[in-house]
Amino acid sequence: MIKQIKRKKVKKNVVVGVVHIQASFNNTIVTITDLGGNTLSTGSAGAVGFKGARKGTPFAAQLASEKAAEKATEYGLKKVEVLVKGQGSGRETAVRAIQNSDIEITAITDITSIPFNGCRPPKRRRV
């Protein structure tokens, strides 16, 4: 039988990174990358344990960003720039949860795409 070679996973030491927060009405996804765009950690409301309509709540976004920040601090992350996309309810709480962790925020930018009269939007909901 051939012996398998086990390679040790090299932990990168990253000091500066970027936090991408994608907040839709149904879910909030937090991805923390280095400046090159390589993913260090991710967190989403579904991965934390929420299902269905509860994934879109601000509390779920808070727990998702706390989990992602906790994983990213293992890489030695100290300063981040925050990029927020979408108009979901978890936008502010996700940013606030990262502020409360050990990571210092240098800039907060909104990168939500707005059409210059592009595609026709879906019809209005009648509830």
UniProtKB/Swiss-Prot annotation:
GO terms for molecular function: rRNA binding; structural constituent of ribosome. InterPro entries: Ribosomal_uS11, Ribosomal_uS11_bac-type, Ribosomal_uS11_sf. One of its GO terms (cellular component) is ribosome. SUPFAM superfamilies: Translational machinery components. Keywords: Chloroplast, Plastid, Ribonucleoprotein, Ribosomal protein, RNA-binding, rRNA-binding. It is found in: Plastid, Chloroplast. The keyword rRNA-binding applies. It comes from the Eukaryota. GO terms for biological process: translation. The keyword rRNA-binding applies. Part of the 30S ribosomal subunit. Belongs to the universal ribosomal protein uS11 family. This is Small ribosomal subunit protein uS11c. It comes from Heterosigma akashiwo (strain NIES-293 / 8280G21-1). The gene is rps11.
